């Protein structure tokens, strides 16, 4: 019988003390994705992530990590400064002085080697005679201006060198010029990735999105018979796309659609399931965007719920757990708890920190909408608690929700409740809704069999 005796208050309190709630810093560290992201990023793209970590982690460790990251680049002055900081020294070792001289000499060499062709490509008369046919362009430049294939390749080499020096704007321009003329598909693909990285690092988001599209097309065509190569390249593109994803509003819809497309959602599920964090954040924050159509948003939400359910065994964090709690388990208390943890994770994530407030706002709307759908009479205090608000804030929130969504509800201030008017759905309407889903699934199966 003793085994069935409920635990005493003292036992419960001692247990709570032994497992106190995690701090925001502990939650952030537990769900830090940096080690998973680094293998899919160019070293120059990793640098902003380390810079962001400077205010959160041990500064000495971050400085050392920056040094290890960049020591093989041609950013010699910056690397030398990092070495001085690590070693607490005012002098610069001879190896850095020597490397700096070598870098300057190479820059001079590349500049001279590509001088003729860069001048030609800045001449409006010459550019005006160029067409979409690269072979014809090369023939025209060779016959009229003595341009050789080696001169074209010098643009590629010079662009790569400028990128290694951290001159991303110059690199983007040189790689663009090379791509206009070159017929070397492998080098053109490499130039596209280099230009994408350069546009990201100069925060030229519109140009970056153009390069995302070009990289996507290159993956589909150049690697058509190489499934493993496509998987690897799609994984890179997914990770590189995170930079414009939350920094450039027009990119949000384009990239959300891309990530949900069959080839890319399959890549995420098989190769990098942690990207679900960013997809979930994008879908949830899409709720508050004025131009977003309700039907498209509902479709994205359904797709997200499906993927979170499928991948729960493989990857989870407070953001995906929030989706699971609210839409799979229908556990409002757990959803509230996970929302609090999700906010800590969002504010410590380089890509999501700017979306944290929008996520919390949208998530509260989703909690309240789901809660209101299944309750006829709602206690304002109870709903406020579930939203992580005090009663006054909760009351204002609910008033705004009713006004903004035009839901049929009345607030009884005396009783402190909200009375929801849920019109009964006719049997005919229920049959129609169920038939719609069955008809769609039949179409999908028929299409699959036809293939």
From Swiss-Prot:
An annotated GO cellular component: eukaryotic 43S preinitiation complex
Gene Ontology biological process: formation of cytoplasmic translation initiation complex
Record-linked SMART domains: eIF3_N (SM01186), PINT (SM00088)
Annotated InterPro entries: eIF3e, eIF3e_N, PCI_dom, WH_DNA-bd_sf
Record GO terms (molecular function): translation initiation factor activity
Highest taxon, organism lineage: Eukaryota
UniProtKB keywords: Cytoplasm, Initiation factor, Protein biosynthesis
Predominant localisation class: cytoplasm
Listed SUPFAM superfamilies: Winged helix' DNA-binding domain
Secretion signal, residue range per the UniProt entry: none
PROSITE patterns: PCI
Subcellular location: Cytoplasm
PCI domain mapped to chain residues: 256-425
Family of this protein: Belongs to the eIF-3 subunit E family.
Role noted for this protein: Component of the eukaryotic translation initiation factor 3 (eIF-3) complex, which is involved in protein synthesis of a specialized repertoire of mRNAs and, together with other initiation factors, stimulates binding of mRNA and methionyl-tRNAi to the 40S ribosome. The eIF-3 complex specifically targets and initiates translation of a subset of mRNAs involved in cell proliferation.
Assembly behavior: Component of the eukaryotic translation initiation factor 3 (eIF-3) complex.
Name used for this protein in its record: Eukaryotic translation initiation factor 3 subunit E
Organism: Aspergillus oryzae (strain ATCC 42149 / RIB 40)
């Amino acid at each position: 019988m003793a085994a069935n005796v409920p635990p005493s208050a003292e036992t419960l309190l001692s247990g709570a003390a032994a497992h106190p709630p995690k701090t925001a810093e502990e939650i952030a560290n537990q769900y830090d994705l940096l080690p998973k992201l680094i293998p899919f990023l160019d070293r120059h793209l990793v640098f902003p992530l380390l810079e962001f970590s400077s205010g959160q982690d041990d500064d000495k460790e971050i400085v050392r990590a920056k040094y290890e990251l960049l020591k093989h680049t041609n950013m010699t002055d910056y690397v030398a400064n990092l070495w001085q900081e690590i070693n607490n020294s005012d002098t610069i070792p001879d190896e850095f002085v020597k490397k700096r001289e070598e870098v300057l000499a190479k820059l001079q060499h590349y500049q001279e080697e590509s001088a003729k062709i860069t001048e030609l490509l800045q001449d409006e008369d010459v550019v005006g005679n160029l067409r979409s046919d690269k072979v014809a362009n090369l023939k025209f430049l060779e016959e009229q201006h003595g341009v050789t294939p080696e001169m074209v390749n010098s643009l590629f080499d010079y662009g790569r060198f400028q990128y290694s020096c951290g001159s991303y704007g110059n690199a983007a321009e040189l790689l663009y010029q090379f791509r206009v003329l070159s017929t070397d598909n492998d080098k053109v693909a490499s130039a596209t990735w280099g230009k994408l990285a350069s546009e990201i690092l100069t925060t030229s988001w519109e140009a970056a999105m153009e390069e995302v599209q070009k990289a996507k097309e290159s993956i589909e065509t150049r690697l058509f018979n190489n499934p493993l190569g496509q998987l690897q390249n799609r994984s890179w593109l997914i990770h590189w796309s995170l930079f414009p994803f939350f920094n450039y509003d027009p990119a949000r819809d384009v990239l959300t659609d891309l990530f949900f497309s069959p080839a890319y959602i399959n890549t995420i599920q098989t190769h990098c399931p942690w990207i679900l964090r960013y997809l979930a954040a994008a879908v949830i924050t899409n709720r508050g965007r004025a131009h977003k159509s309700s039907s498209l948003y509902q479709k994205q939400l359904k797709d997200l719920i499906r993927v979170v359910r499928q991948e729960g065994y493989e990857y989870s964090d407070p953001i995906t757990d929030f989706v699971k709690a609210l839409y799979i388990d229908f556990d409002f208390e757990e959803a509230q708890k996970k929302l609090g943890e999700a906010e800590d994770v969002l504010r410590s994530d380089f890509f999501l920190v700017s979306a944290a407030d929008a996520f919390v706002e949208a998530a509260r709307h989703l909690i309240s909408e789901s809660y209101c759908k299944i309750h006829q009479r709602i206690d304002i205090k109870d709903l406020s608690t579930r939203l992580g608000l005090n009663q006054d804030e909760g009351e204002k929130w609910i008033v705004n929700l009713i006004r903004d969504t035009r839901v049929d509800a009345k607030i009884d201030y005396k009783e402190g409740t909200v009375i929801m008017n849920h019109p009964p759905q006719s049997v005919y309407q229920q049959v129609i809704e169920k038939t719609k889903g069955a008809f769609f699934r039949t179409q999908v199966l028929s299409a699959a069999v036809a293939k």
